[in-house]
């Protein structure tokens, strides 16, 4: 059970990292070009400066997430708190973008998925810190045996699938003048 919890936690962290980095990078088109996009996205023009900041912060949070997840999985000091900081930064940047999208254009997709996954992962990371679970799962010490390699491999596999499948799940929300910009 402890091995499964460790693997599930790392997989969700990897998914959140992918969503955070791709979400930040994907927002760049709106952050720099909302006034020229037309349609619903043109409604985001008043907040272009804020979106530019969110792009930088989201990508930085995703990179910090890579660092913190490696520290956590290896049982290094500060790994858990660094991971919480990453998840809070990701949730805040995604939440602000969610708010702008909902109020200005009336739709939150695809950022809504990023926000939900980040908050869910944050809940997992907070729950594993409960004393009974924390002692069993062992994120405060280096993993034994093949557990770290298995968790890392599973996380890379799932992240790779998610990245390769991006045109499938992102395409419906990335149409510009009838052209699918996600393909």
Residue ranges and their predicted role:
Residues 1-183:
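Topology signature of small-to-medium multi-pass alpha-helical membrane proteins
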């Amino acid at each position: 059970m402890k091995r499964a919890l460790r693997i599930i936690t790392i997989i969700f962290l990897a998914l959140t990292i992918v969503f955070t980095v791709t979400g930040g990078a994907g927002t760049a088109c709106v952050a720099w070009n909302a006034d020229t996009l037309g349609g619903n996205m043109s409604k985001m023009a008043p907040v272009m400066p804020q979106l530019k900041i969110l792009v930088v912060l989201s990508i930085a949070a995703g990179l910090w997430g890579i660092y913190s997840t490696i520290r956590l999985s290896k049982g290094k000091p500060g790994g858990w708190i660094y991971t919480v900081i990453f998840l809070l930064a990701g949730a805040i940047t995604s939440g602000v973008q969610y708010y702008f999208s909902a109020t200005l254009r009336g739709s939150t997709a695809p950022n809504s998925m990023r926000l939900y996954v980040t908050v869910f992962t944050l809940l997992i990371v907070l729950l594993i810190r409960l004393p009974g679970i924390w002692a069993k799962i062992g994120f405060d010490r280096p993993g034994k045996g093949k557990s770290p390699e298995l968790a890392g491999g599973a996380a890379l596999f799932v992240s790779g699938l998610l990245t390769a499948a991006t045109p499938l799940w992102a395409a419906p929300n990335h149409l510009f003048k009838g052209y699918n910009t996600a393909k």
